[in-house]
Amino acid sequence: KQLTALTELGELSQGIVLLHHAILAYPDWPKWQEIVGFDPQFSGYRIGETIRTEIADPDHPITRGVEPWEMIDETYQMMNAGEGCHVLLTCDHPRNAHTLAWTRQYRGARVFCYQSGHDDRTWVNPIFREVLRRGILWTAGRI
């Protein structure tokens, strides 16, 4: 049922926002790999890590005017976003994928994937919230 709903979102050109663990939600679905832009397998995580977030594309509407920042979040040891993904945020944490946030197209839908957002230590960060807000607006075609 979920797979059918997601497939229909792409056909209806509805925006898709995937936050934190949602990126890894269906690792055995080939269609999910098409939506997120890589094989969503991971080999480990660690909660409460300090992550220095870097801006990969300072000209994208989601990241325009955003400066690099640090936040406390959960790290994921997983693959980086793949071909067809437009990388927005990165980090060099040794226990995390290099890619933190990216956009892509899935059929007619704009997709925004943002690995961050584990708990309140991340959510209190105003830059994290602003990037997420802009990501939602971007998927809706409003910026």
Question: Where do the PLM segments sit?
Answer:
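Short alpha-beta junction capping motif
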Residues: 1-26
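Solvent-exposed loop/turn segments at secondary-structure junctions
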Residues: 22-26, 93, 118-121
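Short glycine-/acidic-enriched loop or helix-start segments at secondary-structure transitions
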Residues: 1-2, 27-29, 99, 123
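Stable alpha-helical elements in mature extracytoplasmic
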Residues: 2-5, 28, 58, 128-132
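Glycine-rich, charge-decorated loop segments at or immediately adjacent to ligand/cofactor-binding or catalytic sites
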Residues: 24-35
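Extracellular ligand-binding/catalytic regions of CAZymes and related secreted enzymes
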Residues: 96, 106-143
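Catalytic beta-strand/loop cores that center a nucleophilic Ser/Cys/Thr
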Residues: 38, 44-111
